[in-house]
């Protein structure tokens, strides 16, 4: 039963599921496409999907500034 759960999570069999990289940091496909993820309740899913898809990098390229000028805490990244 436990081995089947580990295979379903796609984790390494020699480590428990809570210590895998997917449990600590979900992959980009989970952030973009998994609507049922627990990150969605904290707003992390929406902000991180914008960062992964390159919205912040595009805003940096338009504003000709460093990437720290883009505010990733708001729902829509704005240029300072």
UniProtKB/Swiss-Prot annotation:
Keywords: Signal. Residues 1-21 are annotated as: Disordered. Residues 1-20 form the signal peptide. Residues 11-21 have a biased composition (Polar residues). This is Uncharacterized protein Mb2668. It comes from Mycobacterium bovis (strain ATCC BAA-935 / AF2122/97).
